[in-house]
From Swiss-Prot:
Belongs to the DNA mismatch repair MutL/HexB family. Disulfide bonds: none annotated. GO terms for cellular component: mismatch repair complex. It comes from Symbiobacterium thermophilum (strain DSM 24528 / JCM 14929 / IAM 14863 / T). GO terms for molecular function: ATP binding; ATP hydrolysis activity; ATP-dependent DNA damage sensor activity; mismatched DNA binding. Keywords: DNA damage, DNA repair. The keyword Repeat does not apply. Pfam families: DNA_mis_repair (PF01119), HATPase_c_3 (PF13589), MutL_C (PF08676). SUPFAM superfamilies: ATPase domain of HSP90 chaperone/DNA topoisomerase II/histidine kinase (SSF55874), DNA mismatch repair protein MutL (SSF118116), Ribosomal protein S5 domain 2-like (SSF54211). This is DNA mismatch repair protein MutL. One of its GO terms (biological process) is mismatch repair. This protein is involved in the repair of mismatches in DNA. It is required for dam-dependent methyl-directed DNA mismatch repair. May act as a 'molecular matchmaker', a protein that promotes the formation of a stable complex between two or more DNA-binding proteins in an ATP-dependent manner without itself being part of a final effector complex.
Amino acid sequence: MARIRLLDERTANQIAAGEVVERPASVVKELVENALDAQAKRIVVEVSGGGRELVRVTDDGIGMVPEDARLALQRHATSKIRTAEDLNAITTLGFRGEALPSIAAVSQFELITRPHDQLAGYRILAEGGQIVAEGEHGCPAGTRVTVRDLFFNVPARLKYLKTNATELAQIGDILTRLALANPEVAFRFQSGQAQVFATPGTGDLTAAVAALLGREMAKELLPVDYRNDAARVHGFVGRPTIARAGRSHQYFFVNRRAVRTIAARYALEEAYAHLLPNGRYPVCILFIEVEPHEVDVNVHPTKAEVRFQRDREVRAAVYQAARHALGAALLIPGTEVTADGEVRVPDRAEEKAALQRGWVPPGAGRPGEGGGRAAPPPWRVSAGGPGGQTTAREPVQAYLPAGGLQAALAQRAAEEAAAAVPAVDLAEATLVPRSAEPGELIRALRPLGQVHRSYIACDGPEGLYLIDQHAAHERIFFERLYAAAQEQATAVQRLLFPLTLDLTPAQMAIWQENAAIFAESGFEAEPFGGNTLLIHGVPAGLGTDHVARLVCDFLDRLQEDQVAPGTPVTDRRRRVLAAMAACKAAIKARDPLQPEDIAALLSDLAACASPETCPHGRPTVICVSISELEKRFKR
């Protein structure tokens, strides 16, 4: 058996680096946190090659004398705590004394520093954790740390790094969180020769949000400030209209430390429980302030998670803070609050006049008006009116039976009595029977009309068929868009006026990595300075109403995408984008359809390779069999 022996310092530092330095973003986080602890007011971060080739952090903080600079490269050397009791009330971002020696152990490392009261600075060069040169050096007050060739001596770690764009996105996300947590500090982030973002450093959180997340998002945030016995919660929560497809826009800070906290996340999402559909997540920038001794920040190697002593009360504070903000903001469009606190509803005379003129589906527009996707003309099966058809131009009274209100009430009573008849249990309905190919079966269907302007009822060989018009159109659009993207032949609709879209630094880096997927899917876009994207064209048929949300949702999905080695990433992402675009472009429930529209929809669905489901796996067609109908009618 091998004898137990002490590891040499160099090996021990490389092992420690495995815990502290996971990727270039970890280096940036540790160095910027050191700068913040040094009371810096200006921080410049420069990277190259996604952080592999270069990471440089320059600050105007208090700097270090030569003795402290040398000591900083020793493990567990720190100015931030003295005893174990200090761990119970940590007020600094760093405290373990592991960051600099761990980073130096796996890189070509340079430290240049000067206190404000010293005339000369000091420079230390290290390679693989060993100091190779040091001495006086002319420099401005503050500290500059340069890290080159990260993991040059640990090639196994290099294999697990992602593309430069992905690593840059991770760095951008870390810096976004640190800059939001410290709006009084001016941050500048540069990748190569391009400036990614710059914050003003005025202490105004709204200005920092606008610089980092975009002006449009800053306009849609609601202020939050709530306090209970355990915590104070302040910052912003987003209106439900800007909810995202993932949680990448949830920023939580505990005592100014950017953290992941499941307790706060659950509390926030519970506050939005009845305001957002499944799969949509609220936006927030929330600062949680608790007594330092009531939160443990030493429970994770990277200090990314915390544990609250009064977890239940903190969750309650987050929940109440969000609920109060949402309650104070009138989420119903068109209402206003007068000076004396009275809620005023605007005059509906104009809407009544519009109703007399006839209803126009959302997005359809009127003759001569621009807009997005044109909705089909209104059509529905009706018992009244010539030919069983009622046009949208008829006044409201045309929908009442002859005899006025009394007849309407009698008709309502008859409908309620009819509702007592046992309904068909759709759980007992089946998908398309497999006695024939789905396409052939759909071609054999005879459309009867719309049900609730959402489903198409058809007579078919096995019984009554119901087709979800949205799911069916989704499948059609998906297969066309996906096939065209594979062949790089997607038809593009050029926009008369380009759309501008503000992205986060992480989203912009992800877009740059996946620009080819967007291009082959029909999106013509280019960077427009900073983190702004200029969109010149979209896939034909998509329209412009949902382009911004579609692009942001897809980028959010990619940001959270964990891809195993060897996975055909491009094709999978192409499918995801096609499915998301199809969902946005497809006709919706409650869209009225003309008979010719229904016939075209069925014909196109029958031609699909997989007409049974939409691209998300929901059925497009179900069948209520003849035997089930006979059973329900007691035949």
